Design a protein with these regions (language model features):
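A metal-dependent, Asp-based hydrolase signature
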Residues: 45-81
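Active-site neighborhood of HAD-like aspartate-dependent phosphohydrolases
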Residues: 1-41
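A short acidic, helix-capping loop that chelates divalent metal ions and anchors anionic groups
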Residues: 22, 44-49, 120-122
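Short helix-capping segments at alpha-helix termini
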Residues: 25-32, 70-75, 105, 129-133
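An amphipathic alpha-helix signature
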Residues: 20, 33, 37, 57-65, ...
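Substrate-recognition "cap/lid" segment bordering the active-site pocket of phosphatases
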Residues: 111, 118-159
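Short, acidic loop-to-helix structural element flanking the phosphoryl-transfer center
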Residues: 57-58, 75-112, 122, 147
Length: 159
């Protein structure tokens, strides 16, 4: 039997440091990134709990717009694009490449899973230099359910 390990991407494999710089630039406070990302994950959880689905890119943008409104700042289309496009170029954490190679050497399959679109997943893995270390990668867009909903469904199959 082949064994596989599934990896979340953002904050697990990929370092949000580039996003941190964007939030420091626009809010003078890097902590705002954590607030925004928490709001984004919360929004995806609520949407999923309602049995609905919204593309994660659109949800990211809407959450960013809300954050700017809450902060009394204007979000131009250029600024929005600048911040959100940083997602495409997140570096892998220092230990990721060595760890993935070790898992591959042990014969384990490695699979990346993300709320982002499939094109975005491939672009992120490519830009981080780790695409070739994965046997497969998936986006929740294929099933129109966020990962938390997918995990719930998978868990019910094991009962």
């Amino acid at each position: 039997m082949k064994k596989a390990i599934f990896f979340d991407m953002n904050e697990t494999l990929l370092n949000l440091s580039l996003l941190k710089k964007q939030f420091e630039k626009h809010f003078e406070d890097a902590f705002v990134l954590k607030y925004w990302f928490t709001k984004l994950l919360y929004a995806s959880t609520v949407v999923g709990a309602m049995g609905d689905y919204t593309n994660f890119g659109a949800l990211s943008g809407a959450t960013l717009e809300t954050l700017f409104v809450e902060s009394g700042k204007e979000l131009t289309p250029e600024t929005k694009n600048e911040i959100l496009s940083a997602f495409r170029h997140l570096p892998a954490y220092e230990d990721v490449i060595v760890s993935l190679k070790r898992l591959k050497a042990e014969g384990l399959k490695t699979i990346a899973v993300s709320n982002s679109s499939l094109a975005m997943v491939k672009e992120q893995l490519t830009n981080a230099g780790i695409l070739d270390l994965f046997d497969a990668y998936y986006s929740v867009d294929a099933v129109k359910r966020y990962r938390n909903g997918c995990y719930t469904r998978l868990g019910s199959l094991w009962r």
